[in-house]
Swiss-Prot record:
The lineage of its organism: Bacteria, Pseudomonadati, Pseudomonadota, Alphaproteobacteria, Rickettsiales. This is DNA-directed RNA polymerase subunit alpha. The gene is rpoA. SUPFAM superfamilies: C-terminal domain of RNA polymerase alpha subunit, Insert subdomain of RNA polymerase alpha subunit, RBP11-like subunits of RNA polymerase. Its EC number is 2.7.7.6. It is an enzyme of class 2 (transferase).
Length: 340
């Protein structure tokens, strides 16, 4: 019977995730994941982008209260902008909350001045991420007081769909953008593993508002997908599939793979065979210097093998405990499904 585990164990798995920040743009990062099976770059990139832009928790202002103002179609004495424009500006205030409960912030200003987000009194539980963001312009000798309620949530919640129950008279619900991720783009390029050059490389560009690091946002999105997909695994694995999981080895099972099963050039394969290197475990115990002393084995062959070893998170010069095992042929056959 065909082993079920071959459906996932035979696929190449990404072994490199690189994060690169942009010094000129705060809270923006480039994330590179490789290698991926052909087509998986688009599959994962699209899924990650959707989750990043819709499902992460963040903080936002959900309602405001201004003395003597009962609705958004009013005007505030001494304020250049009308209430609708002030609300629009308040929607652009970016927050980070350190507690799950809602908090009420205060804003007090005396003109003439430009009222900014940094003038909001937040307390210790809330942090303003864009303090220079303009809320309104206040005229000379005029005062402005405002109470702002902020909460934790996800996505974009319209004021008409707000979960604020029975707001007091004079308190105005506003649209709330909770998502800490501002933008996500991705592209897919080819990458090489050994002699195969058409594997996928996923490159993502993620920018947040500072409430969450891009690296953390990507990790949370991946965890959300993992939790959602877990339900679809509805089959029982065969005993031979479970065997690989229950047995413990003091080293990676990939070391039991024979080197003649690797996709090596003829020159590299012959060099390993002539040097009596049979298993990957035999190979990784050698240093790069040892390999370069092998007859007819040059730098090109070395780099070729290094790329293949990286696919399994292996390298030259490894210290492998208990190698070689006495029953190496039996172990190699038993663990064959875990690395094929």
């Amino acid at each position: 019977m065909l082993s079920l585990s071959k459906n996932w164990n035979t696929l190449i798995k990404p072994n490199r995730v690189a994060y690169e920040n942009f010094p000129e743009i705060n809270n923006k990062a480039k994330i590179v994941v490789e290698p991926l099976e052909r087509g998986f770059g688009l599959t994962l990139g699209n899924a990650m982008r959707r989750v990043l832009l819709s499902s992460l928790q963040g903080a936002a202002i959900t309602s405001i209260k201004i003395p003597a103002i009962e609705h958004e179609f009013s005007s505030i004495p001494g304020v250049k902008e009308d209430v609708s424009e002030v609300i629009l500006n308040i929607k652009g205030v970016e927050l980070k909350m350190h507690v799950a409960e809602k908090r009420i912030m205060k804003l007090k200003a005396t003109g003439p001045c430009v009222v900014t987000a940094g003038m909001i009194e937040t307390g210790h539980d809330v942090e303003i991420l864009n303090p220079d963001h303009i809320i309104c312009n206040l005229a000379k000798n005029k005062q402005l007081e405002m109470a702002l309620t902020c909460k934790v949530g996800k996505g974009y919640v319209l004021s008409t769909n707000s979960y604020e129950d029975d707001l007091p008279i004079g308190e105005i619900a506003i649209d709330a953008l909770f998502n800490p991720v501002k933008s996500v783009t991705y592209k897919v390029e080819n990458t090489r593993v050994g002699q195969v050059t058409d594997y996928d490389k996923l490159i993502m560009f993620v920018e947040t508002n500072g409430g969450l690091l891009p690296e953390m946002a990507v990790g949370l999105a991946a965890r959300i997908l993992q939790e959602q997909l877990q339900l679809f695994i509805s089959f029982e694995e065969h005993e031979e599939d479970k065997q690989v999981k229950t047995d413990t080895l003091p080293f990676s099972p990939y070391l039991l793979k024979r080197v003649d099963e690797l996709e090596l050039s003829v020159r590299s394969a012959n060099c390993l065979k002539n040097d009596n290197i049979i298993y990957i475990g035999d190979l990784v115990k050698r240093t790069e210097s040892d390999m370069l002393r092998t007859p007819n084995f040059g730098r090109k062959s070395l780099n070729e093998i290094k790329e293949i070893l990286a696919k399994f998170n292996l390298r030259f010069g490894m210290d492998v405990p208990d190698w070689p095992p006495e029953n190496i042929q039996e172990l190699s056959k038993r663990y064959e499904d875990s690395y094929n």
